[in-house]
Amino acid sequence: MLLSELSHPNELHGLTVSQLEEIACQIRERHLQVVSTSGGHLGPGLGVVELTLALYQTLDLDSDRVVWDVGHQGYPHKLITGRFSQFDSLRQQNGVAGYLKRSESKFDHFGAGHASTSISAALGMAIARDRKGENHKCVAVIGDGALTGGMALEAINHAGHLPNTPLVVVLNDNDMSISPPVGALSSYLNKVRLSPPLQFLSDSVQESVKNIPLIGKDIPEELKNIKGSVRRLAVPKVGAVFEELGFTYMGPIDGHDIENLINTFNAAHRLKKPVLVHIVTTKGKGYPYAEADQVGYHAQSAFDLTTGKSIPSKKPKPVSYSKIFGQTLLKICEQDSKVIGITAAMATGTGLDILQKNIPEQYVDVGIAEQHAVTLAAGMSCDGLKPVVAIYSTFLQRAFDQLIHDVGIQNLPVSFVLDRAGIVGADGPTHQGQYDISYMRSIPNFVLMAPKDESELQRMLITSINHKGPTALRIPRGSGLGVAVMDEGWEPLNIGEAEILEEGNDILIIAYGSMVASAIETAEILKGMNINTCIVNARFVKPLDKNLIIPLASRIQKVVTMEEGTLIGGFGSAIVELFNDNEVNIPVYRIGIPDVLVDHASPDQSKEKLGLMPDQMADKIIQKFKLNN
């Protein structure tokens, strides 16, 4: 059977193991073809092909529920649930999303982009099923990296307390999240991974007991307890953590042996209780380059399938903001041993990999544990260290209470560097960094800043580390502007001090962070229409430079704010509040992201749809203030 002919996942039910293995090869071929052409997540999906096929042969996806954690693993799922022909549009505007999305397919039972949510969602579905008197199966598929997240452990704790609630948790253990997982749980799984299967040994003990004369089929409770003890003696520690938490543990199982996987899943479904099936897979399976470099091939831009090398862009791009940050922090750490870089499983993405390689004693990776990262940093700062928490804007949302309770209220000197702030592109609404200005501006004691270019990033970083209270510095995804940077001698900024970049009397544009460059382009367009613009680089949204902004606004009388963030509670709102609090009655036109979810597309496509391109903004300004008369 051809993968392209598969119209419904239930069509897998009648296939032989050899036919499923053939489809597995076709899935990998299609997966590699599309990702090598347009980019996307590579390694995670390649590792779960057999797991997906075997699991779906044991389920009826018209009624059963499967929740995939994160969604990185979801490409094989998409290919066998009716999206084969559209898969070329992966992560492109109006195309197939890179993550599971309920609005895209009835088989995407729960959307996700952030880690560690699957067990909670699947347990919620299982409880709803039981309350309604239904009997369909509920399954969560979670990676070992996502299992380090506190939310996953909270869900396991809850599910284990419900012994009569059938739930299957499939642990896809590839010894890797995006980067290698860290912590005691990861070390524990490493030991388990090398052990023989547990549940089947347990069953063989039970069969032996059944054959004892005088007992027959009835096994007294005492002997059941003995069975458990024998199991522990035979395979010490294997699965003990999960069993003590109320789960029946099965595994570890070879995640690329389809026949064994099918048998295991069928056995798990029959138990009618919380079960954890431990599957050992190879991230990047079937593509040697991805197997050899599991971090580098987690996600890829377009690459040559033959060589595995990225296809260079036609025009060389400047160094990314993330790398500039990482390189600068490394220099600072070399000069000050109290500075500590902290990440939540995103060393490469945030640029901290260079610190990890060069000064590992000043680097901490907490795993997928954003809440812990924030409070860990707070504790460090209490005793004289200078923590710098590098984290994606979208992921810091998960630690909002810790920002308030553990950092803001205590006014602790913790520096946050919010990567991927603003429009991120192909990862879509779960990853857009559009909310951080709004959610952090409300926290007392925080100083919020954003650089206009790479050089200002360096100055803001040293400003943050030197500041005696909490700070948040937001940087955009992707390349910088090509502005020269320094290896040392960065001059700190005065907190709350903006700068005038261009003088003009017709319009005042106050721009924040990445939108400063767009403001300059917009001003050039307006200049061609004899409209002279005053451009202010705000630098800070909290505190604002009211001594600069209010006099300029009072003189020019027409104010435009520009931000790459949501308008509700954002930078523009801060300007309006400043004027209102100081009884300045001046019209303000706010340009930013309206109250919408920004879907997957290229950053420029998203900005164009939102009206954030310079030519669009120039037209809006002309219409708003009737400057074309």
From Swiss-Prot:
Mg(2+) binds at residues 144, 174. Thiamine diphosphate binds at residues 72, 113-115, 145-146, 174, 287, 370. The keyword Cell membrane does not apply. It is an enzyme of class 2 (transferase). Keywords: Isoprene biosynthesis, Magnesium, Metal-binding, Thiamine biosynthesis, Thiamine pyrophosphate, Transferase. It holds the Pfam family Transket_pyr. It catalyses: D-glyceraldehyde 3-phosphate + pyruvate + H(+) = 1-deoxy-D-xylulose 5-phosphate + CO2. Pathway: Metabolic intermediate biosynthesis; 1-deoxy-D-xylulose 5-phosphate biosynthesis; 1-deoxy-D-xylulose 5-phosphate from D-glyceraldehyde 3-phosphate and pyruvate: step 1/1. Catalyzes the acyloin condensation reaction between C atoms 2 and 3 of pyruvate and glyceraldehyde 3-phosphate to yield 1-deoxy-D-xylulose-5-phosphate (DXP). This is 1-deoxy-D-xylulose-5-phosphate synthase. The lineage of its organism: Bacteria, Bacillati, Cyanobacteriota, Cyanophyceae, Synechococcales. The gene is dxs.
